[in-house]
């Protein structure tokens, strides 16, 4: 029996062109601020281009999947119809699931029951996909790739992306393949070093903060150490997160000044909340991403003609 979805299915499509080897796409996270990145991806899909190497953190890794599967406007439908629901993000979820974000709703119910996810198109793309998660025991960023998106039964599996998205203090630790993981942004918010290490010589960096943003210390050190007393590496990384973030941001800006990177980011401050459910604000952010993505696409096509 054919699966029934509550929304009209959006079939995936293959890209018209994959950019040359050595061009990497770097995607910051940021919770629902990540719908800015989804808007940029919409512009890339509109132009039919796909990057040969994609590395993302948290929401950046998650939103990139609809881009790789070529499902235009899928992320926009999620903003319009599902982000406002309490199952997506709410304090109620903390009581029910011990997590602000409803990860079962986001990673299982939406793609399986509401807006189908085109695994066939995603899994056949000849690109390198990398989702970063924080290993709570070692304190290192672990990278999950294409093979991790395919479960033991051969079907699509989003558990590795869930591990990348599990926001500290707001979410439960994710058990996956013998490890314990939280949001990759704890130690690697902007995965530019991963893109460099994997051999890329030009990087398109999508940020979810405006130019001039400097990440402040998280604070509440004693509370964090108590909360993660069983996982001291998590507390240590959270205490230095702002320093690492600002260093990664500086590296991106230095590369851009050298002509080795292109940065796409919101033009105005977008607020501190990663849990905003204001549809008007999020759609405005999405549309801004699409507009800036179109400009970036024109530059990319000229550069790699």
Positions of PLM-derived features:
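Patatin-like phospholipase
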Residues: 1-57, 65-305
């Amino acid at each position: 029996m054919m699966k029934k979805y509550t929304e009209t299915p959006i079939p995936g499509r293959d890209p018209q062109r994959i950019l040359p080897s050595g061009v990497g796409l770097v995607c910051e996270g940021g919770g629902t601020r990540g719908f800015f990145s989804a808007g940029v991806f919409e512009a890339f899909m509109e132009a039919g281009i796909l990057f040969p190497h994609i590395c993302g953190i948290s929401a950046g890794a998650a939103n990139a999947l609809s881009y790789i599967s070529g499902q235009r406007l899928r992320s926009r439908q999620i903003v319009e119809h599902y982000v406002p629901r309490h199952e997506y993000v709410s304090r109620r979820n903390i009581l029910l699931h011990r997590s602000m974000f409803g990860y079962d709703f986001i990673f299982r119910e939406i793609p399986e029951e509401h807006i189908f996810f085109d695994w066939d198109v995603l899994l056949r793309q000849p690109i390198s996909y990398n989702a970063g998660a924080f290993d709570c025991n070692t304190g290192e960023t672990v990278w999950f790739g294409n093979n991790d998106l395919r479960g033991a039964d051969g079907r699509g599996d989003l558990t590795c992306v869930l591990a990348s998205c599990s926001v500290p203090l707001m979410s439960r630790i994710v058990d996956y393949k013998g490890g314990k993981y939280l949001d990759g942004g704890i130690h690697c918010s902007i995965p530019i070093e991963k893109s460099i290490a994997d051999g890329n010589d030009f990087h398109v960096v999508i940020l979810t903060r405006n130019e001039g943003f400097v990440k402040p210390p998280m604070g509440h050190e004693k509370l964090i150490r108590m909360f993660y007393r069983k996982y001291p590496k998590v507390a240590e990384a959270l205490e230095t997160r702002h320093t690492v973030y600002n260093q990664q941001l500086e590296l991106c800006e230095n590369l851009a000044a050298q002509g080795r990177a292109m940065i796409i980011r919101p033009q105005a401050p977008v607020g501190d909340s990663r849990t905003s459910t204001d549809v008007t604000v999020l759609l405005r952010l999405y549309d801004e991403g699409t507009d800036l993505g179109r400009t970036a696409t024109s530059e990319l096509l000229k550069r790699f003609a």
